[in-house]
A protein has these predicted regions:
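Non-catalytic accessory/interaction domains
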Residues: 1-198
Length: 198
């Protein structure tokens, strides 16, 4: 593993094997569990191996790898497309906390695009990535659902509304129209996304 300080200091190389034979060593997640406060940049081969089993990593490692890849891309030290590929590879069934952060990030990245064809393409892509997660949690709360699902739902609906997702837009307009005659039909937790999406 090559360790390269961000302050421009000398790089060092170390073999991290955890007692395994070098011939059978596979790429491990550096900073497993996110215990350290630093970013990790993998070479292309190591990143490809991690990305290939990304859906099987623990939630903390998925979160850490996503955050590392995003931070390096935003700093110009790696391609932002690597972050987008990882986000697209995140299963819809992944931890709601991990998905909530990715939905917020995708909504934030939208602001980097000027109105036009590239923004429209990005929004369509983001909608394709986030829609299966919304299909899992649904538009409405279920009895006994975890609080993380409720928070994820609101974040997804806001992000998808911003992206111009047609299903979210249609549902927002329907709920907005119903609320015109009976405001109690619009629950406090849905007002924001309905008003934005309508």
């Amino acid at each position: 593993m090559r360790i390269e300080p961000l302050n421009g200091g000398p790089a060092t190389e170390r073999l991290v094997s955890r007692g395994r034979q070098q011939e059978t060593w596979e790429t491990s997640v550096v900073n497993a569990g996110g215990a350290g406060y630093y970013r990790v940049s993998y070479d292309d081969a190591a990143f490809a191996r991690l990305a290939g089993r990304f859906d099987r990593l623990p939630a903390a490692d998925q979160f850490g790898l996503l955050k590392d890849t995003l931070a390096l891309g935003m700093a110009g030290r790696g391609p932002i497309s690597a972050y987008l590929r990882l986000t697209a590879a995140l299963p819809a069934s992944a931890d709601p906390i991990v998905w909530r952060e990715q939905a917020r990030t995708l909504a934030g990245l939208d602001g980097f695009y000027a109105p036009g064809a590239k923004r429209a393409a990005y929004r369509a892509w983001a909608s394709d990535v986030l829609s299966p997660v919304l299909a899992r949690v649904g538009f409405d709360a279920r009895d006994g659902e975890p609080a993380a699902d409720a928070l994820l739902r609101e974040t997804l609906l806001l992000a998808l509304g911003q992206a111009g997702d047609p299903k979210v837009g249609a549902e927002a307009r329907r709920r907005f129209a119903e609320a015109q005659t009976d405001l109690s039909r619009l629950a406090p937790g849905e007002r924001r996304w309905v008003l934005i999406g309508a």
